[in-house]
Curated annotation (Swiss-Prot):
InterPro entries: G1P_dehydrogenase_arc, G1PDH, Glycerol_DH. Belongs to the glycerol-1-phosphate dehydrogenase family. This is Glycerol-1-phosphate dehydrogenase [NAD(P)+]. It comes from Natronomonas pharaonis (strain ATCC 35678 / DSM 2160 / CIP 103997 / JCM 8858 / NBRC 14720 / NCIMB 2260 / Gabara). Its main location: cytoplasm. Binds 1 zinc ion per subunit. GO terms for molecular function: glycerol-1-phosphate dehydrogenase (NAD+) activity; glycerol-1-phosphate dehydrogenase (NADP+) activity; metal ion binding. It holds the Pfam family Fe-ADH_2. It comes from the Archaea. It is found in: Cytoplasm.
Length: 352
């Protein structure tokens, strides 16, 4: 008897384009959310445009409150929850980069209230996914949460954000290329459930960014448009899968281990991008697509070597050989790879 079922949670509205920040209140009204909005932001976006966001909520008849978070931590999540309760917030709006969006997402999930994602940078696919990422000590935790009810991504704001944040978002998407290969491998060898739809969507998204990498240039709003659409597609793939598998494989394990070994040295997206060069080589060997991955990263000014990440070769090899210990997720790293194999892969691909 067939008993399989699934529950896919997706954003109800995705608004992307020039000046769409001014349509945030309109998007919220279409969701019929009740109560007071709590805008969760960090110091930089607060200086940039939070007044603009607050004023349109006021014009629409809302009484918004604002919470500014200084760091990403579980304590920050708890403080936002306390603020939301004190301000009797009906829904939360994450406004800024990955930090306020992840914190607002997790706080809204804990309070079982609505969450709206309003990114001002395209640094990773957390702007639309059902995962929150929070560091604790030398470990970064990925926590399940409901995805946003709406995503409002103003390409004008995003195009004016620091270029390295955009290149990190691009690299995060390009790394989906090897994440899907790891997922397929785990399906074949460990009988891990695999979604053809989610896998194909994630793979297509990575391919689209690789194919268009030459068009992604600093200061071009069209580049922000391409990257945001890719980040949305990646987040949707994870929601369909009910897992981060479509966008997180061995390259993410290596990145998480780098967070432990060399904390706050490089951006997450840049780390997974460099790691994906190595993991593609491990998957496919000398004749594989690692050069294509590397060249796509280079064309958008993203790092392609450990040195460009600011990480010495010894630490990168240590992260690669111990990354399998991070979590119980089968990848091309298996139960760990030998030091000599890691050095050979990193040296052949030019990562070292």
């Amino acid at each position: 008897m067939f008993e399989k079922s699934t529950w896919i949670r997706l954003p109800r509205s995705v608004v992307v384009g020039h000046g769409v920040l001014d349509r945030t209140a309109e998007a919220v009204e279409e969701l019929y959310l009740d109560g007071r909005p709590l805008i969760v932001t960090s110091p930089t976006p607060e200086e940039l445009a939070v007044d603009r966001l607050r004023e349109q909520f006021v014009s629409a008849g809302f009484d918004p409150a604002v919470a500014v978070v200084e760091e990403a931590s579980f304590d920050a999540v708890e403080r936002v929850i306390e603020t939301a309760e004190r301000e009797t917030a009906g829904f939360l709006v994450g406004f800024g980069g990955g930090k306020p969006i992840d914190i607002a997402k997790m706080a809204a999930d804990e309070r079982n209230c609505g969450f709206i994602s309003v990114p001002t940078a395209a640094s990773h696919d957390g702007i639309v996914s059902g995962r929150g990422s929070v560091p604790e000590g030398d470990t970064r935790h990925s926590v399940a949460a409901h995805p946003p009810l709406a995503v409002i991504a103003d390409t004008e704001l995003i195009a004016n954000s620091p270029w390295r944040l955009t290149t990190a978002g691009c690299a995060d998407i390009i790394s989906n290329y090897t994440a899907v290969k790891d997922w397929q491998l785990a399906h074949r060898l460990k009988n891990v459930e695999y979604s053809e739809y989610a896998g194909a969507l994630s793979q297509m998204t990575a391919e689209m960014l690789v194919d268009n990498s030459a068009s992604i240039k600093r200061g071009l709003e069209e580049s922000a448009w391409i990257v945001v659409k890719a980040l949305v597609s990646s987040g949707v793939a994870m929601s369909i899968a009910g897992s981060s598998r479509p966008a997180s494989g061995a390259e993410h394990l290596i990145s998480h281990q780098l967070d432990r070994i060399a904390p706050e040295t490089a951006l997450h997206g840049h780390q997974v991008g460099v790691a994906s060069i190595v993991t593609e080589y491990l998957h496919s060997g000398e004749g594989g697509d690692w050069r294509r991955v590397r060249d796509a990263l280079a064309s958008i000014d993203a790092p392609t070597t450990a040195a460009e990440l600011g990480i010495d070769g010894e630490r990168f090899i240590e992260a690669t050989t111990s990354a399998h210990e991070i979590r119980d997720r089968y990848t091309i790293l298996g139960d760990g790879i030998e030091r000599e194999a890691a050095i050979e892969a990193a040296a052949t691909t030019g990562v070292l």
